[in-house]
Amino acid sequence: MNAGICVCVLLAALSTSSCLSLPAVSEDGGQSDLGIVMEHTRHTRAAPSSGQLSLLSKAEDDEEPRSSLTELLARIISTKGTYRRSPSPKSKSMGNNHRIKDRDYLGWMDFGRRSAEEYEYSS
C-alpha cells in the first residue's frame, strides 16, 4: 500500500517537473529560441495594475457582448432569408395522385372499424 502511494507521488513529481521545465536549447539556434521563450514568459507574467485591469475589463465586457450579439443577429437574419416557408418543389412533384396528399389520409378516423368490418367473425 505504501509502495503504491510512493510510486504515485514520484510519478506526479516527475510529470510536474517535466511540464514546467523549458525545452532543451540547441547550439545553432538556441539564442533566438531562448530569447523568444524568455520574452513570452515575461509577457505572460506581466500584468497591468488593478485599476487599469478593471477599467480595461469593463470596457471589453460592455463592448464585446454587444458586438458579438450584433454579429450573431446579422448572421441569423441573413441565413433566415434562405429558408422557404412554402412547400418545397419536391413535394409538388408528387402530383395529385399521391396517396398521402397534404399529409391527410381520407379515412383516418375509422381505421379500426374498417378492419373489423372486413373480417367479420362468426361467433
From Swiss-Prot:
Location(s) in or outside the cell: Secreted
Sulfotyrosine, modified sites: Y105, Y119, Y121
Region spans: Disordered: 43-67
Chief location: secreted
Residue ranges the record assigns to the propeptide: 20-103, 115-123
InterPro entries per record: CCK-like (IPR015499), Gastrin/CCK (IPR001651), Gastrin/cholecystokinin_CS (IPR013152)
Biological process according to GO: digestion; feeding behavior; growth hormone secretion; peptide hormone secretion
Gene Ontology terms for molecular function: hormone activity; neuropeptide hormone activity
PTM notes: The precursor is cleaved by proteases to produce a number of active cholecystokinins.
Entry-annotated residues carrying Phenylalanine amide: F111
Endpoints of the signal sequence: 1-19
Domain of life, source organism: Eukaryota
SMART domains per record: GASTRIN
Induction entry: By lipopolysaccharide (LPS); in hypothalamus.
Tissue: Expressed in the ovary, kidney, gill, gastrointestinal tract and pituitary. Differentially expressed in the brain in the optic tectum-thalamus, hypothalamus, telencephalon, olfactory bulb and tract, preoptic region and posterior brain region. Expression is strongest in the hypothalamus, where localization is to the posterior ventrolateral region. Expression in the brain is transiently increased 2 hours after feeding. Abundant in the sensory layers of the vagal lobe and along the border of the sensory region of the lobe and the deep fiber laye.
Alphabetically ordered keywords of this record: Amidation, Cleavage on pair of basic residues, Hormone, Secreted, Signal, Sulfation
GO cellular component, one term: axon
Function field: This peptide hormone induces gall bladder contraction and the release of pancreatic enzymes in the gut. Induces the secretion of gonadotropin and growth hormone from the pituitary. Suppresses food intake and decreases the expression of preprosomatostatin genes in the forebrain.
Family in the record: Belongs to the gastrin/cholecystokinin family.
Name of protein: Cholecystokinin
Organism: Carassius auratus (Goldfish)
Lineage of the organism: Eukaryota, Metazoa, Chordata, Craniata, Vertebrata
